[in-house]
UniProtKB/Swiss-Prot annotation:
GO terms for cellular component: host cell mitochondrion; host cell nucleus; virion component. Signal peptide: none annotated. Keywords: Cap snatching, Eukaryotic host gene expression shutoff by virus, Eukaryotic host transcription shutoff by virus, Host gene expression shutoff by virus, Host mitochondrion, Host nucleus, Host-virus interaction, Inhibition of host innate immune response by virus, Inhibition of host MAVS by virus, Inhibition of host RLR pathway by virus, Inhibition of host RNA polymerase II by virus, mRNA capping, mRNA processing, Viral immunoevasion, Viral transcription, Virion. GO terms for biological process: 7-methylguanosine mRNA capping; cap snatching; DNA-templated transcription; symbiont-mediated suppression of host cytoplasmic pattern recognition receptor signaling pathway via inhibition of MAVS activity; symbiont-mediated suppression of host gene expression; symbiont-mediated suppression of host mRNA transcription via inhibition of RNA polymerase II activity; viral RNA genome replication. This is Polymerase basic protein 2. Gene3D superfamilies: Polymerase Basic Protein 2, C-terminal domain. HAMAP family: INV_PB2 (MF_04062).
Amino acid sequence: MERIKELRNLMSQSRTREILTKTTVDHMAIIKKYTSGRQEKNPSLRMKWMMAMKYPITADKRITEMIPERNEQGQTLWSKMSDAGSDRVMVSPLAVTWWNRNGPMTSTVHYPKIYKTYFEKVERLKHGTFGPVHFRNQVKIRRRVDINPGHADLSAKEAQDVIMEVVFPNEVGARILTSESQLTITKEKKEELQDCKISPLMVAYMLERELVRKTRFLPVAGGTSSVYIEVLHLTQGTCWEQMYTPGGEVRNDDVDQSLIIAARNIVRRAAVSADPLASLLEMCHSTQIGGTRMVDILRQNPTEEQAVDICKAAMGLRISSSFSFGGFTFKRTSGSSVKREEEVLTGNLQTLKIRVHEGYEEFTMVGKRATAILRKATRRLIQLIVSGRDEQSIAEAIIVAMVFSQEDCMIKAVRGDLNFVNRANQRLNPMHQLLRHFQKDAKVLFQNWGIEHIDNVMGMIGVLPDMTPSTEMSMRGLRVSKMGVDEYSSAERVVVSIDRFLRVRDQRGNVLLSPEEVSETQGTEKLTITYSSSMMWEINGPESVLVNTYQWIIRNWETVKIQWSQNPTMLYNKMEFEPFQSLVPKAIRGQYSGFVRTLFQQMRDVLGTFDTTQIIKLLPFAAAPPKQSRMQFSSLTVNVRGSGMRILVRGNSPVFNYNKTTKRLTILGKDAGTLTEDPDEGTSGVESAVLRGFLILGKEDRRYGPALSINELSNLAKGEKANVLIGQGDVVLVMKRKRDSSILTDSQTATKRIRMAIN
């Protein structure tokens, strides 16, 4: 009521009425803007205005007991007035200074753990080196880059579950931590954050930084890994760049880099196998990168690279809808086309069957070192605007665009026959044939393309057939631009299908990727890549094949031993012995195999001649298709270290050396593992092989007479029991089986039962 009276009183004064009625308030919008809503419209002004007041800050009442009323200089730190509209007190900025200097100390042990990403950034900058500044035109192109170094690769949803579990473990709500990485991180963080006093909200924010990849679409001219992006503002301007070497690596960049190398190796290897798709999947599932399963990384990591995308497609994951040709990523920005098969004649009168794209289309082409805009019609290049780091990169882009245009003058520029093959010795498809041909030598292509006069357009320049720049003339339709072409920004992913030969198609049937598009660049991975698949043993050369083959036999000796005695053919056909065949001289492979198989058969027939070391040593040679011959060998040759080296059939050699005392096997001086049983005992390791058809009943039973040797067992009648002396001088009681059908399981249980009987 008081307020209303006051207002009436004001209005009765003529001056008030005059001000309010005569002042033009023609901008209702402005008044609305500054008076409606809770959002501060001019924060910096508001801040300055507030800070000019004596007590601009409010604090909890308890602060008055923790802070003196005045500081050492006698300035008042808080007001006795309480804040209007809340039960807080008004505090001076000087109170903050006092608190920072004299307030209570808490433990700082958790800070480096919570603010890990910041602490690590400081370290990287401390140890980084900044070089000279160069002034030059920067060709920047927008790319999707990772702006957050040092993160794991969880999806937003996975991270949310981890954060809730770590920060608010007792909150209600369904949280299912399924992936390996989720569980590991949760356990680690819970331990780190015991008794942590930092506000849960802050902890949650910082955890999010650590767990989730954040990407932005930024103009970049140079390194795109996250340790370069974090200093982008220091390393490149509009007309300058500063050289910089990061002072440390981060795992997320290492994962991206190692993933690309692993994927390329796997796709290249799968392409030459009998069933590329099955092989690729087998390898992806059995490979680890830096201790994490490759398939888990593929599910989480958004890296777009040809080989990585082929692996993702094989796993049924969505990938980007752009397609790849000649190492460039093409994205159609407008137009459409239909495809039609057409036969064309090369300059050498060779017939090629190509799929012609009919219709007008525009594309962006983005490569590692060059980018372009391409406009084309049916078998005709209308315009190509290229920008790139150097002449070489620009030429690469021009060749790819000319081939992609399918123009007749390009096809007529072919000299000689086209017979390029892929790694599996299959002919490449015609478009890749043309591409390879001109990548080798584009002289004729550029000469025959044709030249035109050009207008002077800002930022554009012509390019002549010898790749020199010109302002007067240019190859037809071609211009070089100072400006780069941005990468396709959308992160949209589409469902794709993949065929047996690793060709990836979108739902309309357009080929997006194929093994031909996978880069041949070799690099050294930053994280250890462990390929468990035998297909990848070759990647490190012949020695690695040799060591891996023998390691595999030793690791799986229990099963190998049983198969050796019961189903040798199945054993010889195992894919793990495939890589080994490339080490054996082709001319003699068959004879070696026949010889070893005969030797093994004799071992099976003559009881007690079983020799573990010898079986392991010779087994890989038996895998080749055998040739029957009377030839005997005392040593077998393998091609390693650039020459033939010998493996002795009986005894040790530098290639295969078994130390009886330590039971360790060394292959070419490298440790290949330990044999669990002693191969010297004529019968050791033969237990499960020889006690086929006998049931082990238990420990020795004197009622059944003295212990027989294994060789004497064969005289027992079905159902008869006897004590038998096995391997290391132990005696067990056995009974000869009445039926033969259960023989297979015998050898599998024999070893276990013998152990039990002895112990």
